[in-house]
Structures are given as C-alpha cells and as structure tokens.
Amino acid sequence: MEKKKILVVDDEVDLVKTIKFSLELEGYKVLVSYNGEDALNQARKENPDLILLDIMLPKLDGYKVCRLLKFDEQYKHIPILMMTAKTQEKDKLMGKETGANEYITKPFDMEELMEKVKTYLNK
C-alpha cells in the first residue's frame, strides 16, 4: 500500500522538522515547504492527501494558498488543517471562509495533531 502524502507548510524550520519526524514515525510520506508560493506549487505538483498549513507565511499567506486550492476543482478535495498562533475568532472565521477543514492554534499538542491527521486521512 502506498504511503499517504502530507504537505507541511510553515516558516518555522524547527516546528516543520518536529512535525515531519512525528508524521514519518506514523508511516506517512512528508513533503515540506517554508513559504506560500512554494506550497502552492508543491500541492499542485504532488497532489498530497492532506496539507498542514500555517497562515503567516512569506510570499503568499496561508489564507490565499487555502483559497486557491479549495476553489480549484482539481484540488478542493484535499483536507487542509490550518496551524496558527492567531487565536481570535475573526481569524478562525477567516480560516473557515477560505475552505480550511480545521483550525489548530499554536502551540498545539503533537499527539492531538496526529489524531486530527489520522481522522482526516481515514475518511
């Protein structure tokens, strides 16, 4: 069986390494990106099974990346879990409006993140 592919997008290198390590331990293939423009290109090229997406990114913010993917017939099926330090209700609402499936606030518990990933990939 082919490994499920997850794209992790965040400009915090250490966080990306930690998430990547945890996901690989669970048996997932992990792609990484540190800016929105690259994330969009990778998502279109690799067609991942799930995207973990930060909001505050260089080049193209997470809201725009999410919106561009969710309003494209070819990619709208990909679950997107937004990860962010933004905790206000208006930020969560904006995340939902762009089509994000889930909104996870930082700092988050890695076990909780892994459970959310499993939930979306087993649907």
Q: What do the predicted segments below correspond to?
A:
Residues V16, P58, K76, Q88:
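The feature encodes the CheY-like receiver
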Residues G27-Y34, Q42:
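Short hydrophobic/Thr-rich beta-strand motif most characteristic of the beta2 strand and flanking loop
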Residues F108-V117:
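C-terminal output helix
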Residues E46-L52, L57:
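Active-site beta3 strand of CheY-like receiver
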Residues K17-L25:
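Charged docking surfaces used in two-component/phosphorelay signaling
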